[in-house]
A protein has these predicted regions:
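Short acidic, glycine/serine/threonine-rich loops at helix termini
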Residues: 23-25, 49-52, 159-167, 209, ...
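Catalytic palm subdomain of template-directed nucleic-acid polymerases
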Residues: 117-138, 211
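DNA-contacting surface of Y-family translesion DNA polymerases
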Residues: 13, 205-347
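Short Gly/Ser/Thr- and Asp/Glu-enriched loop/turn motifs at secondary-structure junctions
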Residues: 110-114, 154-157, 297-301, 348-352
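Acidic, metal-coordinating catalytic segment for phosphate/diphosphate chemistry
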Residues: 23, 318, 322-422
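Residues that scaffold, gate, or flank divalent-cation-dependent active/transport sites
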Residues: 1-112, 116, 241
Length: 422
């Protein structure tokens, strides 16, 4: 028998529509639904990626994350350079709006332009329906910032996210709701599967080769087949196929991973030869060392990821374990170089590289180095950190940062890989 005291959960996930582009339109006194505007770094040339396109351009078929040259030539549009710190400030103002209505314990910030909110305990307090409460917050966001929001609602976090991603954009008020029954009625046979959260294009193609085209197919597929495709995530996917997600915001916030890693990735300004990419990768390893020292931790291993200019070439990855955990710059730089030159197959020009410090442990839990040179280098790196914190990241540079292929100086002016606008 169902416990009458158990209140059914109601979650909302609010998305700020074409956030960066909308902010740039508002700041120019333009209507995002009428102005053709993209946020992109024009200095990267016609191949520069558009971080956001205005709703007006989206309505004309221009896709988000396209490259500048992919926009039809007959469309005249504004190119707004990215200002990441400015967008962060805008997002903080919007977060303050949420806090007027709900506690921070009931908010999970998923990204700069998207957050989950547990509305369950507030509906009775405000004497409002779930849609009414969501609309109240969305209206205040629009009134205060000029940014339009859309909202997905559901009886669990997954259903709220799917309602947002697939249904909300088709609703006049920008709000859509799903429970398990509605999910199966409206979306169980929806195609393509890549429209669903956590299923990418490559996974969709694998599923289609196995005769699986929709969530209903996943729900009825042999578990052994799904385990081969999804690995340890198979049972999460099966739950999602049935509209089930037991995880709560409180559980997400309380979660602490058993191991920690530090990762950074960089899209190169042009296609790089392998010998050129090594320079950027060593810069990234050096910055990673500074980051580890600043956090007083060491890495037990290192991984690099490489994406090639030829999109048909699959991404390559290579890893290395250290005999003892380290945060020494020269060790990380040497390891990164060895992985790229000796472990990554040379199949063509490189467009994107990533580096990750794996299984990070506290510095005081590891053995001290017996080598005086390591101790000296760490002392130098700590001094470098202090100088950079006080005078800026470009106040002191390595010789490698001055090479023509290097990207470190430019990256130091960015937030999340994009220009801060400062």
């Amino acid at each position: 028998m169902k416990n009458e005291n158990l209140q059914e959960k109601i979650y909302a996930v609010i998305d700020l529509k074409s956030f960066y582009a909308s902010v740039e339109c508002v700041e120019r006194g333009l209507d995002p639904f009428k102005a053709d505007l993209v946020v992109a770094d024009a200095s990267r040339g016609s191949g520069g990626v558009c971080l956001a396109v205005s709703p007006a351009l989206r309505a004309k078929g221009v896709k988000n994350r396209c490259r500048l040259f992919e926009i039809p030539r007959d469309i005249k549009f504004i190119i707004a350079p990215p200002r990441m710190q400015f967008y962060i400030d805008y997002a903080a103002r919007i977060y303050e709006i949420y806090l007027k209505y709900v506690s921070k314990e009931d908010i999970y910030v998923y990204s700069i332009d998207e957050c989950f909110i547990d509305l369950t305990s507030y509906l009775k307090f405000y004497a409002l329906g779930a849609k009414e409460m969501a609309k109240m917050m969305m209206d205040e966001i629009l009134k205060t910032t000029g940014v339009t929001a859309t909202c997905g609602m559901g009886t669990n976090l997954y259903l709220a996210k799917i309602a947002l991603d697939i249904l909300a954009k088709h609703q006049d008020d920008g709000i859509a709701y799903l429970d398990e029954e509605l999910y199966k009625k409206q979306l169980w046979t929806h195609q393509p599967l890549s429209d669903f959260w956590r299923i990418g294009k490559q996974t969709r193609l694998k599923l289609e080769k196995c005769g699986i085209f929709c969530m209903k197919d996943i729900a009825n597929a042999p578990k052994s087949l799904l385990e081969k495709i999804f690995g340890v995530d198979a049972y999460i996917t099966i739950d999602h196929a049935n509209g089930i997600e037991p995880t709560t915001i409180a559980e997400i916030k309380a979660y602490k991973p058993s191991t920690k890693s530090y990762f950074s990735s960089e899209i190169l300004p042009r296609d790089y030869e392998r010998c050129e990419a090594v320079i950027v990768l060593k810069e990234m390893a050096d910055r990673l060392a500074l980051r580890l020292i600043n956090k007083e931790v060491k890495a037990s291993g290192l991984t690099i990821n490489v994406r090639f200019a030829d999109k048909l070439e699959p991404q390559q990855r290579a890893s290395m374990r250290f005999k003892t955990p380290t945060n020494v710059s020269s060790v990380l730089m040497s390891a990164a170089e060895e992985l790229l030159l000796n472990k990554i197959k040379n199949v063509g020009l490189i467009r994107q590289i990533g580096i990750s410090a794996n299984d990070v442990v506290k510095e005081n839990l590891t053995e001290f180095s017996l080598f005086e040179d390591d101790a000296k280098e760490k002392a130098v790196l700590k001094s470098l950190n202090l100088i950079k914190e006080k005078f800026g990241k470009n106040s002191i540079l390595r010789a490698i940062d001055l090479l023509p292929e290097a990207t470190g100086q430019d990256r130091n002016k960015k937030i999340g890989g994009h220009k801060s606008g400062e």
